[in-house]
Amino acid sequence: MNSISVLSNNQKVFYDDDYNRHEQLKDDLLEFLENHEDVQQRKTNVKATATDWNMKIKSRELDLFKAGVLDFMLNIPFDTGGCFRHFQDRRRFHMIDCWGNIYRKGDYTVDHTHLPSQYSWVYFLKSKPNYSPLLFDYWDQKKRKMKSVKILPIESRIVVFPSCLHHRVPVHIHDETRITISGNIE
């Protein structure tokens, strides 16, 4: 597990690149997502094709993956900062929602947070490292300007972060799709 400090108050973004069932998950979901209609109709922060907030697909692989995300949460040192200062019993975390985002050329996501959730995650199901990154924006007090922390969209990478962190995705400029699965945890 890797982490990157995002803000001066020690909030961190955690990520890992080796989900061991990535190929099975991709095989199970790719056709469903590539051909999915834009249920959200670009009325959310995601200006790309998006599924329902709770993806409507029966998938053993997706169920295993979501359980793996909750297991990943068990390894995060929650004393390193977050949106909420009260102690969270990590054994009681549960998945609130899980949706897919399908970025085609010209698509993007505007700056937003996932409040009132506690933690959120993004998984790069189909991507290349040169595709649009996930950007976490913050105010640099010392330099008195906005800065960004860039997370490369490496296929099979899971990124977990406090839901209060501002994040966005720049315009996707490639012909192939960039597909993520995202969710919130409480």
Each model region followed by its residue ranges:
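Short beta-strand-to-coil "C-cap" segments at the C-terminal boundary of structured domains/repeats
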Residues: D18, I185-E186
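Catalytic core of non-heme Fe(II) oxygenases with the double-stranded beta-helix
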Residues: R92-V171, E176-T180, E186
